[in-house]
Amino acid sequence: GFDVIDTIK
């Protein structure tokens, strides 16, 4: 998503 917030989830 934005940044690594939902990218790692």
Swiss-Prot record:
GO molecular function, one term: metal ion binding
UniProt key word Metal-binding: yes
BP GO terms, sorted: hydrogen peroxide catabolic process
Enzyme class: oxidoreductase
Keywords: Calcium, Heme, Hydrogen peroxide, Iron, Metal-binding, Oxidoreductase, Peroxidase, Secreted
Localization per record: Secreted
Coiled-coil ranges (or none): none
Cofactor notes: Binds 2 calcium ions per subunit.
One GO term describing the cellular component: extracellular region
EC nos: 1.11.1.7
Required cofactor names: Ca(2+); heme b
Domain of life of the organism encoding this protein: Eukaryota
Catalytic activity of the protein: 2 a phenolic donor + H2O2 = 2 a phenolic radical donor + 2 H2O
Similarity-based family: Belongs to the peroxidase family. Classical plant (class III) peroxidase subfamily.
Known function: Removal of H(2)O(2), oxidation of toxic reductants, biosynthesis and degradation of lignin, suberization, auxin catabolism, response to environmental stresses such as wounding, pathogen attack and oxidative stress. These functions might be dependent on each isozyme/isoform in each plant tissue.
Name of the featured protein: Cationic peroxidase
Species in which this protein is naturally found: Betula pendula (European white birch)
Record lineage: Eukaryota, Viridiplantae, Streptophyta, Embryophyta, Tracheophyta
